[in-house]
Amino acid sequence: MTSYQSQLGEGEGIAEELAESQRAISIAEFFEKNKHMLGFDSEARALVTAVKEAVDNALDACEEAGILPDIYVEIQESGDYYKLVVEDNGPGITKEQAPKIFGKLLYGSRFHAREQNRGQQGIGISAAVLYSQLTSGKPAKITSRPKGQDEAQYFELIVDTDTNEPEISVDETTTWERPHGTRIELEMEANMRARSTLRDYIQDTAVVNPHARVEFDEPGLDESLKFERAERAELPDETEEIRPHPHGVELGTLLKMLEATDSYSVSGFMQEEFTRVGGKTADSVIANFNDRHYGRGMAWQPPKVNEDADIERAVEDAVANKGAETTATFAAAVSDAIHDRDRVAYHEVESIVDSAAEDAEADGDTTFGATVRENAVDAAWNAVSDNLSSDLYALVDDVTTKRKDDAAVEGLASRLADKFDDDGRHRLTRDELRGYIDRAADMTEEQDDATFGETARENVLEALWTAAEGVREEPPKVSDIADDRDTASQLLSAMRETDIIAPPTDCLSPISAELVEEGLRKEFDADFYAASTRDASVHGGDPFIVEAGIAYGGELESEGTVDVMRFANRVPLVYQRGACATTDVVKSIRWRNYNLDQPGGSGIPKGPAVIMVHVASTNVPFTSESKDAIANVPEMEDEIELAIREAARELKSYLNKRRSMQQRREKQDKLATILPEMAEKLTEVTDNDELHIDDSLARIMNNVLVEREVEDDTVRVRIENNDDTNADVELTDIVTAEPQVTNGATVVEMDGEWFVKWSPTVGAGETAVLEYSVTDEAEFTVSVDGIEEEKLTVNA
């Protein structure tokens, strides 16, 4: 069959024709044809995405300027289109910057910043402008008044998709009632089918940004929805930009950093360009790099003094024309220094010889030149490495199983010794050493019918590599590493292997457990709230913090599954719920252990609850450009699970206690029915006065009993603790006449009533008495706090 390429080849100049048809495209033109990648894949979702991008911009602008956000969002019907209006009270945007911020994709100030941000790429709001102009043909209308200026600037613009530059049709000044801030108005093809999602997004934004006030209006509302900021809420802590962490860079990034740095040495480069790298850490990186670049020198046990391979005699024989006494002293010094070590490598022998030579030169007129020293090194090293088989046998035998017979171990050791004869210095990398072991093991299996599996080979490798000594060579200059991709790759591997402190967390601004709970309280009417904030962890060199919150009961919907709220860097994630790591973690938890209904033992639990999870990071691993879901990163999933479980344990305690109180209440109700009947029967039988059952009920139920006794002008309030734990009681006795307090209570007068406040701690089985006097007739009303209603009996 004739190929397309052969058909092309039949014509002359076809390559030139094809070349003429090829051209570069701008990023704006690319996204013009791929709107779905940014979250504009349907009319319903497009409106939600546009609101999200505009609100994110508003929140970021306010927080960066230190202004508590006040944001207004309005959606209007405008003929065949919908009009979106978003206003904020931020610092405003300068005349020069506003067109680029709204009309140029990939224009932003935070792309290179390693700190927590809602957005970084500079795509979001300009993508909304692009979608608006593509679907309605109308420009974006922007009004911005920088703080301190008398007038606002008004623009109408579109994105020129050929050049990715703003095309401004209107540029004028105008008046605006806001003292500072920004307003954007977009018309677009959209629909309100995602109305509930849109409202959820606004509410979720209010939950996770309790410091913000948000007002939302849409068609069909009688009045706008207002989400007030939480009391005591303050702006999030300012974040600090950090340098990259050595564990978080890729090879291409490292090469760029090597080319751009002003440092000449690897040590200086590591300390200047990376966070958490000081002198000692840089030395560790260099040591690991040298292992890869130069290799390690195998270190062998020195021969015993009386063995044939006598180091002292070998060095004496190698040194000529230095005088017998000087030579003997020099040789003895070399031999003693080598024998002082358990193992010695070639480069260490070089150092020993140099040191002994310098001492000999200092003691006399003899000079030990380079040739003499080299001869001495070779002689000493040959004596050290004369019989490697026995040394290797001991190393191999120590890490292989007892099932390996001596012949097999000896065979492997002998063949390894032969491999080292090929390199006089016995210097090699870990991979080269692995190759030695594999070839020697293969030959041993083939010739000696012995088996050395992967585990045995790995154990031998580890033993020999541990016995080897790192070389003390200066690493190449930074410029040389930048020019050699393989060397740069060795440096990257060394960085990743080195144990380095996790990056600092001042680049992050978590919400805090207190404000997570406050946000939930503000938006959900529930009976129980709990929240947790984990310590910082690291993924790929980027720090992250996970926070979780749970609300339960109250007015929350009891039918169906619980509501799972997902957030990343204070932004709600409203789409791709099923593709998100947060959802996967929630499904994987056995919620029955926390007293929530979970049919089948897996999946989203059922019940009146809200589970929220917030991930704060300098680099959230989203699954796509639209930032709808968090990727399944094991380190992040682990922290999400731990944060949820921390809050869920509080929920379990609450539900257990509630169940216990319910059972106690049911028991108490039954006793309250039975005891009066028993008391009545006893009264009839004994002809005694009617029995008071409140005291008896309190003692049977182990309750805290509060009783009042009034005798003449004296009032006694008695607290009897029938429980087996201390009771911290907050008692307020409201009296209509002025009391005279005698035992430490405080009195506050208000509107002709006196509030006697008493806060005793009553031990288990003990009684405390508040006594005071009133000179006039009075009425009394007692209020008790600090004790659960089910554990309290009041007869006062």
Curated annotation (Swiss-Prot):
Instruction: Print the keywords alphabetically.
Output: ATP-binding, DNA-binding, Isomerase, Nucleotide-binding, Topoisomerase
> Which terms under GO biological process does the entry name?
DNA topological change
Q: Which GO terms describe its molecular function?
A: ATP binding; DNA binding; DNA topoisomerase type II (double strand cut, ATP-hydrolyzing) activity
| InterPro entries reported in the protein's UniProt record | HATPase_C_sf (IPR036890), Ribosomal_Su5_D2-typ_SF (IPR020568), Ribsml_uS5_D2-typ_fold_subgr (IPR014721), Top6b_C (IPR040494), TopoVI_B (IPR005734), TopoVI_B_transducer (IPR015320)
List the EC numbers from the record.
Answer: 5.6.2.2
- Going by the record, the broad EC class of this enzyme is isomerase
Catalyzed reaction equations? ATP-dependent breakage, passage and rejoining of double-stranded DNA
**Top-level division of the source organism's lineage:** Archaea
| Residue sites binding ATP per the record | 57, 88, 109-110, 119-126, 627
The reply to whether Nucleotide-binding figures as a keyword in the UniProt entry is yes
Q: What does this protein do?
A: Relaxes both positive and negative superturns and exhibits a strong decatenase activity.
Family statement drawn from the similarity comment of this UniProt entry: Belongs to the TOP6B family.
State the oligomer form and interacting partners: Homodimer. Heterotetramer of two Top6A and two Top6B chains.
This one is known as Type 2 DNA topoisomerase 6 subunit B
In its UniProt entry, the species of origin is given as: Haloarcula marismortui (strain ATCC 43049 / DSM 3752 / JCM 8966 / VKM B-1809) (Halobacterium marismortui)
